[in-house]
């Protein structure tokens, strides 16, 4: 077989539906839209959520909650992700972004205690979980809240 002899697999290339090209095509006259009515018209159809005049679900249900504009969003990292650093490294949020451990710092970094840490690191972050502090100090490292 040569490159110029390559062919698509049987049934791989399907002709597009050409509607409104005569009754013999099977998709002529009404072009697969049924008889007359709102849905057969150009731009026809109802908006999303419309229930035929019945009070729609999104208006039947009560409003609930609010978005706290003062809420702080932290980039969370588990301890086992910090094993990529060498012994004695000072781990800062900027270094975490540089090494692509975290995409964005947001309002700070929070270190969580999932996994184990084998390296002696000085970790600087906005927040730490209790278990993370215990594990970092047990490995001989230091914790600094910034």
Swiss-Prot record:
GO-annotated molecular function: rRNA binding; structural constituent of ribosome
Cited InterPro entries: Ribosomal_uL15, Ribosomal_uL15/eL18, Ribosomal_uL15/eL18_sf, Ribosomal_uL15_bac-type, Ribosomal_uL15_CS
Pfam hit, one: Ribosomal_L27A
Record key words, sorted: Ribonucleoprotein, Ribosomal protein, RNA-binding, rRNA-binding
Superkingdom of origin organism: Bacteria
One GO CC term on file: cytosolic large ribosomal subunit
Region (Disordered): 1-56
GO biological process terms, semicolon-separated: translation
Biased composition (Gly residues): 21-35, 42-52
Protein family membership: Belongs to the universal ribosomal protein uL15 family.
Subunit organization: Part of the 50S ribosomal subunit.
NCBIfam families, A to Z: rplO_bact
Role description: Binds to the 23S rRNA.
Protein name: Large ribosomal subunit protein uL15
Organism per entry: Clostridium botulinum (strain Langeland / NCTC 10281 / Type F)
